[in-house]
C-alpha cells in the first residue's frame, strides 16, 4: 500500500536508504564485536572497549535516524540480514584502528553515494538530511581514527604493549 505522505521520494532513494540502514547496522555490529574483544580478560583494554562501544551506539543511532527518515518520507522499510564482521579476533590497537578507519571510509562512501542518488533525483530534503546529520560527522570520525593510528604508530604500539596500555589509559580514558 502506498503512503499518503509520500511526496518527491523516488523509489531509488527509498531502496538506497534501506541499504544504508543495513550498512549502519553492520558498522554497529562490527564495533560491538571490537568493544567486547577489548573487554576480554586476556585483552583488558577498557579505554578501547569503551570507545568502540560508544561507536557502536552511535552507528545504531544513525540507523535509527534513517529508519525514522524513511517513515517520515512515506518510504517502506525492508530490513536485510546483517553481515557478520570479517573477524572475531581484532589483534592490537593499531590493527583494530585500521579496521575501524576502513569501516568509516566505507560508510562515508556509501553516504556520498546516497547523497549522489538524492541529488540526481532532485530530493533536497534527503540531501539536507544527509548533510545535517551525517557527512561532517563522518569526516570527523575518519580524522580522529587517523590521528589515533598515527599516535599508536609513533609509539610503536604494535611491538610495545606498554605503549598500547598507556594509550588506552591516557588517550582512550581506560581505567583499570
From Swiss-Prot:
One of its GO terms (biological process) is iron ion transport. It comes from the Eukaryota. Residues 7-156 form the Ferritin-like diiron domain. Thermostable. Fe cation 1 binds at residues 24, 59, 62. The keyword Iron applies. GO terms for molecular function: ferric iron binding; ferrous iron binding; ferroxidase activity. Spleen (at protein level). Belongs to the ferritin family. In spleen, forms a homomer. The functional molecule forms a roughly spherical shell with a diameter of 12 nm and contains a central cavity into which the insoluble mineral iron core is deposited. This is Ferritin, spleen middle subunit. The lineage of its organism: Eukaryota, Metazoa, Chordata, Craniata, Vertebrata.
